[in-house]
Amino acid sequence: MVHPLFRHAEFYTTVNHIKDLPQATGVEIAFAGRSNAGKSSAINTLVGRGRFAFTSKTPGRTQHINFFQLGEERFMVDLPGYGYAQVPLAIRQHWVHLLSTYLQTRQALYGMILIMDIRHPLTKLDLQMLEWFAQTGKLVHVLLTKADKLSRSKALAVLDEIRQFLSTSYSGCTVQIFSSLTSEGAEEASRLLQDWFDEGGARVQQLNDSEISNQKKTPAKGD
């Protein structure tokens, strides 16, 4: 069953340049991952719609930052997949700039869901993504996708290995098993996203209340 968080999910906008990002007034959670790791399929599974986020058998097709609204001031942000060598160099360089700038400077961004194929986790580019984002001090949760491709015992062994690595190198980064085919892990991921949006919304409200309070304390010119 689809979590109530996604009941009113809808496409909001697509962006190819940092200057075109929508106003950062709400809470955003980014979805990032290597090309063909199952990022769009994971989003579709969470939302409960087969083609909500575009999926393709050709890696590198998600070339823009896509925003999906989950109700007022809540956004899932689908980032371009990285690591597809056949994309022209100029486009790859543009993606690097787009991704790194968004992840490191976006004030509305509360956390990142990092998608890794459970059969090929912690690639060089995955580690680079973690390094980029670790500098922000924001939350990271890893989805080890395509868990149905491994036996249960092997999947759990990989999960334990990745959890130990992250606890040592990136404290605060959490991880779970996920399968778009069987929906394993969808409920767990949905609960985490709900918590993040709630926490992020509370933080935004506190900042707004503080700003209003400061405005009231500041004397108007001429007083």
UniProtKB/Swiss-Prot annotation:
Binding site for GTP: 33-40, 60-64, 78-81, 145-148, 178-180
Cofactor: Mg(2+)
Binding site for Mg(2+): S40, T62
Stored Pfam families: MMR_HSR1
GO biological process: division septum assembly
Every EngB-type G domain range: 25-199
Protein name, entry field: Probable GTP-binding protein EngB
Annotated function: Necessary for normal cell division and for the maintenance of normal septation.
GO cellular component terms listed in the entry, alphabetical order: cytosol
Coiled-coil region list: none
GO molecular-function terms, A-Z: GTP binding; metal ion binding
Highest taxon listed in the record's lineage: Bacteria
